């Protein structure tokens, strides 16, 4: 089924919406105004991004995961895709992000 296919983070259409599985290498990580971002391309304004609110970040930390440590890793992300400075998934729980390759 194409609807459940894993999408390449570099090729996710900006206007796509719905529940998606997206896989790619995290190019950069940053925390800005208490929100953490995992950027998958050179331009965060247009490339795929995962966002973690402060409440979600606390859940990751409770599991012993520093979200900033995803930098450089190949990951698969599950969640509702929306358009905000390019395609974005807001991760609310650590189980949404699976490390495929260190």
Give, region by region, the residue ranges found by the protein language model.
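OB-fold single-stranded nucleic acid-binding module
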Residues: 1-102
């Amino acid at each position: 089924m194409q609807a459940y296919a894993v999408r390449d983070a570099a090729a996710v259409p900006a206007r796509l919406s719905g529940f998606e599985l997206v896989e790619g290498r995290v190019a950069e990580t940053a925390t800005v105004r208490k929100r953490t971002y995992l950027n998958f391309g050179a331009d965060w304004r247009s490339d795929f991004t995962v966002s973690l609110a402060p409440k979600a970040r606390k859940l990751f930390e409770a599991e012993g995961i520093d979200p900033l440590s995803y930098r450089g890793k190949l990951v698969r992300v599950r969640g509702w895709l929306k358009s905000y400075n390019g395609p974005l998934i807001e991760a609310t729980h650590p189980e949404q992000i699976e490390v495929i390759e260190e």
